[in-house]
UniProtKB/Swiss-Prot annotation:
<dbReference type="GO" id="GO:0005737">
    <property type="term" value="C:cytoplasm"/>
</dbReference>
<dbReference type="InterPro" id="IPR003742">
    <property type="entry name" value="RlmH-like"/>
</dbReference>
<dbReference type="InterPro" id="IPR029028">
    <property type="entry name" value="Alpha/beta_knot_MTases"/>
</dbReference>
<keyword id="KW-0949">S-adenosyl-L-methionine</keyword>
<keyword id="KW-0808">Transferase</keyword>
<dbReference type="GO" id="GO:0070038">
    <property type="term" value="F:rRNA (pseudouridine-N3-)-methyltransferase activity"/>
</dbReference>
<keyword id="KW-0489">Methyltransferase</keyword>
<feature type="binding site">
    <location>
        <begin position="136"/>
        <end position="141"/>
    </location>
    <ligand>
        <name>S-adenosyl-L-methionine</name>
    </ligand>
</feature>
<keyword id="KW-0963">Cytoplasm</keyword>
<comment type="subunit">
    <text>Homodimer.</text>
</comment>
<feature type="binding site">
    <location>
        <position position="117"/>
    </location>
    <ligand>
        <name>S-adenosyl-L-methionine</name>
    </ligand>
</feature>
<comment type="function">
    <text>Specifically methylates the pseudouridine at position 1915 (m3Psi1915) in 23S rRNA.</text>
</comment>
<dbReference type="Pfam" id="PF02590">
    <property type="entry name" value="SPOUT_MTase"/>
</dbReference>
<protein>
    <recommendedName>
        <fullName>Ribosomal RNA large subunit methyltransferase H</fullName>
        <ecNumber>2.1.1.177</ecNumber>
    </recommendedName>
</protein>
<keyword id="KW-0698">rRNA processing</keyword>
<comment type="similarity">
    <text>Belongs to the RNA methyltransferase RlmH family.</text>
</comment>
<feature type="binding site">
    <location>
        <position position="85"/>
    </location>
    <ligand>
        <name>S-adenosyl-L-methionine</name>
    </ligand>
</feature>
């Protein structure tokens, strides 16, 4: 299963970018034996729309296109799964998150898209299409830190699925 991260906004060079790249690199190396291929990060420009509703709709359009492209791949399971990161989502532990990623893979999903929304959040139509709306705890995180956290959690999920001692339960 190809795993892609869609993030609204750009991450500038510096220590945060180096850290996120380190975790995505670890995930890219740990994932293939488990049937998980890291397909990269797609940075979506922040919308300049006049209203929050318009901005969310414009930002969601890129994610809808990626989902539609994956669905046209022709798998009977629908092709793609979508996880949205949102402070109002469901909080999970690392083992539960790993189990969900593993189940999506085992169900034959060709692609997993993890989406980090813009400052206004996610479009309601995109939220209704999501397989999981995930909170990274009850706190609100800046987008750069949310990207670091999901990179680390994807790597951690791979190590949990592999039985690697990185995660100590």
């Amino acid at each position: 299963m190809r795993v892609s991260v869609f993030a609204v906004g750009r991450m500038k060079s510096g220590p945060k970018r180096e850290l996120v790249e380190r975790y995505f690199d670890r995930f890219a190396k740990a994932g293939p034996p488990l049937g998980l291929e890291f397909a990269g990060v797609s940075e979506i420009p922040e919308s300049r729309g006049q209203t929050a509703q318009l901005r969310k709709a414009e930002e969601a359009q890129r994610i809808h296109e990626a989902l539609d492209n994956a669905k046209s791949g022709g798998t009977s399971s629908g092709g793609a799964a979508l996880i949205l990161l949102d402070e109002r989502g469901k909080a999970l532990g690392s083992e539960a998150f790993a189990a969900i990623v593993g189940r999506m893979r085992d169900d034959g999903k060709r692609q997993l898209i993890v989406a980090i929304g813009g400052p206004d959040g996610h479009d309601p139509a995109l939220r209704s299409r999501a397989d999981l709306v995930l909170a990274l705890g009850e706190l609100t995180w800046p987008h750069q830190i949310a990207r670091i956290l999901i990179a680390e959690q994807l790597y951690r999920a791979a190590t949990i699925l592999a039985g690697h001692p990185y995660h100590r339960s």
